[in-house]
Amino acid sequence: MIKLILSIILIICFIINSIESFKMITLTTGPPSDLGWNNMINLGRIGVTKAMDIEDSRLFVVSGRNDTYELLLPIIQNDDIDLVICSSLDHGDACKEIAAMYVNSTEIKTQFLVRGSGATTKNLIQFTYNYASVNYLSGMFAGLQTKTNKIGFISPGITAGASDCFVYAFWLGAKSVNPNIKFYYYNIGSYLDKDKTKGAAENLIDVYDCDVIGDTLDDFTASNVAISRGRYAIGTNGFPQRDVYGENVVYTYAYNWTKYFVPIASAVKNKIPPSKWYADFNKDNNLSLYDLSFGFQVSAETKFKIINQTKSFASYVRTLHPYFCNEYMEGYTQKYNLTRQPNTTNCITTTGFIGIDAPVGDMNYLGNYTIKFSKVEFQRSIQIGFSIVSGLLIGFVILMMIGIVKYQDTPSIRSASPSFLNLTLLGGVIIFIGIIVWVAPISTHQCNARFWLVTIGFSTLIGSLVVKNIRIWLIFDNPELKIRTITNNQLYPWVGLCLVINIVLMSIITTVGDLKAIEAQGIDSLGKFEYMTICKMNYTGAATLYSILAYFGTLLLVGVFVSWKIRIVHIEEFSECTAIAKTLYSISFCLFVIVPLMISPQDKQSETIILCVTGIFITTGALLIFFLPKFWRIFGNEKQGSHEHFTQRKQSAVASARAESANRNNSSNSFGFSKSSAQIGNTISGIESLNDDSNESSLSNETK
């Protein structure tokens, strides 16, 4: 007996396992969270899954023929799917193509449910629903509810494969109950484009004063805009919006796809041949596709008119509905060559109705809504701020240049070479001008000018400081204190070389580097429809720019090294090396701080601010460190026109030590000569004339 029971159980299990489970796929164009078409399709999927106890019910979000085809074909070939619900017109072409591939297949048993009223095949089911009737009703509600008598509408349009026949049905419904309405509508080219929908809805409200807006889109974006602007929101995308938004939505219709998906899926499971399915209002509410809902503030009269019209639609054939037969159709069908129903002059056929695309009657078509890209400008206040600061600093530097000329005969200025001092200040002026240009409105010329000015300015400033320091090093850094006459004319070519290197590298950036202004999107925190004008260069230009930075780095390293070498000079007027060293150290330190900031992610405005602040700080700091001590000595210590180091024969401790060492070494050289401390003092006191070419010969005679 036990063996018999076990055998029966095994047979039952075998039979159960041998029964193939029903597998279903549902395709939507958007996520179920859209509170619209896709959500209702998904609810229909869930309803049929529960009703038929389907274990394998999949949902895929996909749109477009190519993407749908690539997604669906491998699944059909490998997963033994029973039913594919292609919910959108977007899926139709791909689903029909795959169905045609396997129409006579003995292995692929998949049935495809597609939207349309075309012919069915062995594996192709057609379903359609009367979308015009519910749009006519929604239009009636809008016409009864509007206070401004201005109604707006948004539709995908012909570019999305949808004619505006349903827009016309909405308008006609509003016109039937309120002849005084003005009707405005946009196409947006898609069933689901939140940005365009939002922009079009805002335009209808702000520009055309529409207080009711309808749509034939997949989501609730248009009504969300209406709610945010304090207008009536109506749900015209098939989702029961009042369940979510409550009394902010005064009217909705909702699809109930479960009523149709269950019998269709059951027919597929029971291997009933495919057929056409049609959904609309029905005398039997259990077979009606649409469920209507009204807000509390909607009058009983309005509700009565709407509900009464639904009963009217269910009582006679669709081809006699008012959106098929009316006073506008005779002239419209003639004008646009659309077919009329036989033996009538004012009734359009279903095919002709689908072909309605141009405005009917006094409909106002506003065209395809396009989003205008907005340009994000650099903050004007920041531009003005940097320009004012740089302008004031230019004025300050010019005053220093005038002071250099006025006090050029004082020891502090004469010993430092007035022409080189002004050349250094000129570099600062060029940098400040470059910063003003840097924050100016961007263009290709501005992109090039700002790099040229800033780099030339830094080459002039840093080059002059480094070359001056090298001269001091060559003069003082010799144990025997031999006279070395190095004139300004001998130094200018070296500063010129610094500029030539800069000019050559910048020329490469300007020409080969393709430095230009471009309009960029998707950078920084720009919105989807915002753009910014930025400067852009190619790989060669970027590599050359790094070469310029390396060149400046090398120049700074040379300057720092020379400053360290001449740290022994303690004569105040000639110890420019101290000021120059401090300047170069400060610049180097700033660069070590700034470079990591620039490498880290920065938006363009922050990057510009960092660069400009750095440029102003480095340049101003360098000039103040270098020039303030000179003017301080002029006004504080040189009342007699000379400093004590110039009036007293006194040398530095290091110089004295070197002189004594030189005396000891030279005393054993019969062909040499020795220098007394007084002679060394004479040498140092005469150095001030090195910057005055006319005094060089007298200086040499004095020190020989």
From Swiss-Prot:
Gene Ontology BP, a term: G protein-coupled receptor signaling pathway
Chief location: membrane
Extracellular side: 22-383, 441-455, 514-541, 600-608
Protein's cellular compartments: Membrane
Spans annotated as Disordered: 657-677, 685-704
InterPro entries to which the protein is assigned, alphabetical: GPCR_3_C, mGluR/GABA-B-like, PnrA-like
Glycosylation site positions: 66, 104, 256, 286, 308, 337, 343, 368, 538
Membrane topology, from the record: Multi-pass membrane protein
Family: In the N-terminal section; belongs to the BMP lipoprotein family. In the C-terminal section; belongs to the G-protein coupled receptor 3 family. GABA-B receptor subfamily.
Name used for this protein in its record: Metabotropic glutamate receptor-like protein K
Organism: Dictyostelium discoideum (Social amoeba)
